[in-house]
Amino acid sequence: MSDLNNAMRVYEKIIKNVLRHHDELLRQTYEQMIDVRKKIDEITRQSIEIASYPKIDLSIESNRGGEHRDLFDAYLKYQKLIRTQKEELINEMHVLTIQAEGIHRIYLCFQILPRVEYRIINRIYVKGELYKTVEEDFGLSHRIFEQKRQQAIQIIQNVYKSDLSNEQIVYLCKGNSIIQKERDV
């Protein structure tokens, strides 16, 4: 059970961090993706440039012995280096894409919270207001306030880990806002 509690605390820290720094995290991720894309373009350009060199004919004898073979080996080694770098950059782009999707999904999950829980989480983590100030403004006992805060984090975790698509989460969010408006009337 201790491992489960530790995992839940880690998820909670990630959720808090994403909510606090959502825009900045997305901006950084997209900037990294642009940098990786530029590197991929450069490697592709180098690959095309290398491929355009005249072929090395190994059947021609050279006065210097193995000069053609050495040049051919260097050429093959460089081609392999380029392929390896390109694969690594594509993998990095894949990781960055997953990271951006995760940030976006956490924020979507936050959007579907019930009104009170949403307002608590929004003020504490998104707006960065002091816990004690928010608690006092809600006029709830500490125990009830903390239960609502924990419940909100739990909802975000559960929806994040669910099989729901992001589109389905958006529909939940839209449904919640309609229900909330009906409750206010």
What are these regions, as identified by a protein language model?
Residues 127-144:
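Helix-turn-helix DNA-binding module
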Residues 105-112, 134:
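Short, mixed-charge amphipathic alpha-helical segments
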Residues 1-108, 162-185:
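N-terminal interaction/assembly modules
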Residues 111, 125-126, 157:
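Short, locally clustered residues in the helix-turn-helix/winged-helix DNA-binding domain
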Residues 145-163:
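DNA major-groove recognition helices of helix-turn-helix
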Residues 120-121:
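A short pre-motif secondary-structure segment
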Residues 96, 110, 139-142:
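Short, charged/polar micro-motifs that form catalytic or ligand-binding hotspots
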